[in-house]
A protein has these predicted regions:
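PLP-dependent amino-acid enzyme catalytic core
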Residues: 1-130
Length: 130
C-alpha cells in the first residue's frame, strides 16, 4: 500500500505561448483530433475517478485516463503511428490531412491512387516514440 505520495512542482512559466513547440498549435491539435475521430473505432478515453486518493489529498478530484480502451489496443501509442501514416498518405496524395478522414482513406479511389503500401511501426519501450 502506498504510504507516501511524492510530487514535483512545475515551475515552468504559465501562458508562455510564444515559446511553445510550434507544431503543437491549436490548428494542428484540431487536425489530429478530427483525424482520429473519423475512425469508426474511436471513442473518448474514459476517466477513472480516484475518489479515495482525492479525499486523502484534500482535493476535489483526481482522475486518470484509462487508455486500455484506445482503439482496442490497450495503449495510447497508436495515436502517433496512425497520425504519422495519415500525414504520409496525405503528402503522397498532395493534400492536407484535414481532407482525409477514415472513409476517404479507405475508399477504393484512394487505394487505386496510392497502390500497395506497407507500414511498419515499432516502439522503444514506454516512451511513445515510434
Amino acid at each position: 500500500m502506498l504510504k507516501e505520495i511524492k510530487w514535483k512542482v512545475n515551475n515552468l512559466p504559465k501562458g508562455d505561448k510564444e515559446n511553445c513547440i510550434k507544431f503543437l498549435n491549436e490548428e494542428e491539435i484540431t487536425k489530429v483530433r478530427n483525424f482520429h475521430k473519423s475512425f469508426p473505432q474511436y471513442k473518448e478515453t474514459p476517466l477513472a475517478n480516484l475518489e479515495g486518493l482525492a479525499k486523502k489529498l484534500g482535493v476535489a478530484g483526481v482522475y486518470v485516463k484509462d487508455e486500455s480502451y484506445r482503439f482496442g489496443l490497450n495503449a495510447f501509442k497508436v495515436l502517433g503511428g496512425s497520425y504519422s501514416m495519415g500525414r504520409y498518405l496525405a503528402q503522397r496524395l498532395d493534400t492536407d490531412i484535414s481532407e482525409l478522414g477514415y472513409d476517404k482513406l479507405t475508399s477504393k479511389e484512394i487505394k487505386e491512387k496510392l497502390g500497395e503500401i506497407t507500414f511498419f511501426t515499432a516502439t522503444d519501450g514506454n516512451h511513445g516514440r515510434g
